Amino acid sequence: MKKALAWTLTLLVTTCLWAQNTSPEPIFPIVQGFGGIFDAPHATEKPDPTLEYKVVIDVATGDQNKSEPFMSLINLARLINLHAMGGVPKENIHVVAVMHKDAMWAVLSQEAYRKKFGVDNPHIPLFQELKRHGVKLFVCSQSLYKREVPFEQVMPEVEVATSMLTTMTTYQLKGYAALKF
């Protein structure tokens, strides 16, 4: 009897511990399929839904795995989704991203990306979804020149900027908060 009770208690405790450790499913309040986040009902520090959020992001980091979207670019979607989860209306979230250094490879057209890396460009659906939600996407022309990438190889969702430096300073002077990914 004691053995059966001990096994039952062990099973019950193990099941309860397992249930506590399972993660909830990510949610996608605005940007669908990218930048999944977890509801944080217990958070005490939250975005102010009455503010207009203007953010310019210096995106420099790429990843080794060229068949998956770069985490730095997934974070663009996370930023938007987190603010939305915090109650900020979509029309009060303004995001500008300028890619350079290793992140600039993400902006290649399907054909150019496949030729360079041997796989389809996984960033195209992400950029299409970001553009659909008003994100302005730029690539630094200086990074393109330095890596000898013709402007014609940039996907249509991304515009060419004079440079990351001038884009960052211009938007900061327009009141955008600066982040670096």
Where are these regions (language model features)?
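A cross-taxonomic marker for long C-terminal extensions/tails that follow the last structured domain
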Residues: 20, 27, 113-114, 119-181
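Long, contiguous juxta-domain segments that are non-catalytic but functionally important
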Residues: 20-41
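Structural recognition of the beta-strand scaffold that forms the well-ordered cores
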Residues: 54-58, 95-99, 136-139, 180
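Acidic/histidine-rich, surface-exposed loop or edge segments in extracytoplasmic proteins
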Residues: 48-66, 108-111
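Histidine-anchored nucleotide/phosphate-binding helix
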Residues: 69-88
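Solvent-exposed, acidic/flexible segments
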Residues: 65-72, 120, 161
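Acidic helix-start/capping segments at beta-turn-to-alpha-helix junctions
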Residues: 89-107
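Bacterial Sec-dependent N-terminal signal peptides
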Residues: 1-21
